[in-house]
């Protein structure tokens, strides 16, 4: 089946800011991304999406869930997540490990190997691996089906392009594959800026998804009754 929205709230668990373990029910920002994924998959058979976002909107959570959904329910899939910092790499892998540990037994694939950076499902011949940008061989020699480039605007500038090329060249242009790029803004130059501009101009095959900060209810406060706006 392909209904990620149903799967996410039925099979995926997240840790909330209050420290509770709860089902992943898509929030407004996540639903915008979900709809963009569904639309591109329906029209092109694959996903190539770049996301310009605010912080704490749950978009890495959504992408991580989507990648786990695919590699844990399909044969011969390999997902790779690359972040800008080792702490972020560890956090995203821990999130995916939580998805796996809390997945209903009926849907949980048999695990052959699990480390601090990789989950391998031997019966499916699928796997999930994480890496930190800055190395020289990310994606080299791999065949990947799903990629998540996290905070691309903050990747180490000296190796960002090499890492990006190695990673994306490992993903064949075939139905069912997916490349997600997401980042907060970081100036008007660099690989993320160029990719975003190309997506907006319609020249590179990526769909631009801009999600404003005010869509998230947690960024809002109730206006006091005696509030008087100033000219500023």
Predicted feature locations:
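Phosphate/NTP-binding elements of NTP-utilizing enzymes
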Residues: 1-232
């Amino acid at each position: 089946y392909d209904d990620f929205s149903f799967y996410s709230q039925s099979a995926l668990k997240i840790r909330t800011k209050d420290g509770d373990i709860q089902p992943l029910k898509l929030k407004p920002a996540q639903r915008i991304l979900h709809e963009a994924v569904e639309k591109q998959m329906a029209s092109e058979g694959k996903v190539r999406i770049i996301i310009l976002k605010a912080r704490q909107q749950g978009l890495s959570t959504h992408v991580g869930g989507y990648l786990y959904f695919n590699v844990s329910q399909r044969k011969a899939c390999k997902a790779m997540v690359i972040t800008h910092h080792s702490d972020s790499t560890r956090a995203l892998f821990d999130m995916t490990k939580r998805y796996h540990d809390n997945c209903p037994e009926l849907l949980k694939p048999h695990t052959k190997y699990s480390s601090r950076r990789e989950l391998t499902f031997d019966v499916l011949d699928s796997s999930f691996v994480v890496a930190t940008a800055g190395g020289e061989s990310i994606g080299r020699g791999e065949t990947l089906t799903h990629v998540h480039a996290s905070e691309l605007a903050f990747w180490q500038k000296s190796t960002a392009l090499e890492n990006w090329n190695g990673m994306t060249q490992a993903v064949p242009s075939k139905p069912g594959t997916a490349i997600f790029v997401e980042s907060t803004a970081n100036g008007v130059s660099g690989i993320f800026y160029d990719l975003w501009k190309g997506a907006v101009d319609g020249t590179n095959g990526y769909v631009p998804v801009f999600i404003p900060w005010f869509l998230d209810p947690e960024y809002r406060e109730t206006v006091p009754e005696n509030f008087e706006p100033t000219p500023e």
